[in-house]
Design a protein with these regions (language model features):
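Bacterial N-terminal signal peptides that target proteins for export
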Residues: 1-8
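Bacterial N-terminal signal peptides
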Residues: 8-18
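Cys-dependent protein tyrosine phosphatase-like superfamily
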Residues: 21-127, 139-203
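Short cysteine clusters
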Residues: 130
Length: 203
């Protein structure tokens, strides 16, 4: 009887405030995925993130193949170190395009446009990464949430801090997020936000 009451309470809690449960998921670190560290869903079906886990280097062939088999359409390396140029990985799910773009300025804007185009065309998701999957990757993911999901600067910074040790929470990166201004030309419809945006607690 006690177990039944507990289940009933949990069911009511979920029905009354499901967004709070979804909000907990976005604020967690991710697992290792075929060698890719801290693999996380940012915007379901549209944007994913992680770290290369290869030192100061881009993704290796095995990691690219795993992303391709997971039906990711584009992988973006947010640095230039060790990058030998754009490539295409073929797999049973199709093709994965691998490119590099900066995590700041026009590079970040290009990443946001790539995500926007993928959503509008109902294409495959985008995966972004840096070396460890926290600083640059987190900043681009945080500003994407501001761009597409109406997330506040404070919420975005709180999201970026997940998995980042306090001593490595660099003011430069935080300021980059706080000062970001969404591009009005890349706005999603309310229906698209409902489909692709995670839930955050009010903040």
């Amino acid at each position: 009887m006690k177990d039944l009451r507990l289940l009933l309470f949990l069911a009511i809690l979920f029905l009354v405030n499901p967004s709070s449960l979804f909000a907990q998921e976005i604020m967690k670190t991710g697992p290792t995925f075929h060698g890719i560290r801290d693999f996380r869903e940012v915007m379901p079906g549209a944007l994913y993130r992680g770290g290369a886990n290869n030192g100061h280097a881009p993704l290796n062939h095995g990691e690219l193949s795993a992303l391709c088999e997971d039906d990711i359409g584009t992988a973006i390396y947010l640095y230039t170190t060790g990058f030998s140029g754009p490539s295409i990985t073929h797999c049973s799910k199709g093709d994965l395009h691998y490119i590099d773009k900066s995590w700041e300025g026009s590079g970040r804007a290009t990443v946001h446009k790539q995500v926007y185009d993928s959503i509008k065309s109902k294409g495959k998701p985008v995966f972004i990464h840096c070396w460890y999957g926290i600083h640059a990757t987190g900043a681009v993911a945080a500003t994407a949430l501001m761009q597409f999901c109406n997330v506040s600067p404070k919420q975005a910074v709180d999201y970026w801090k997940v998995g980042v040790p306090a001593k490595l929470q660099y003011p430069k990166v935080i300021q980059s997020i706080m000062s970001f201004k969404p591009n009005p030309a890349l706005q999603l419809t309310p229906e698209e936000r409902d489909r692709y945006c995670p839930r955050f607690n009010a903040n």
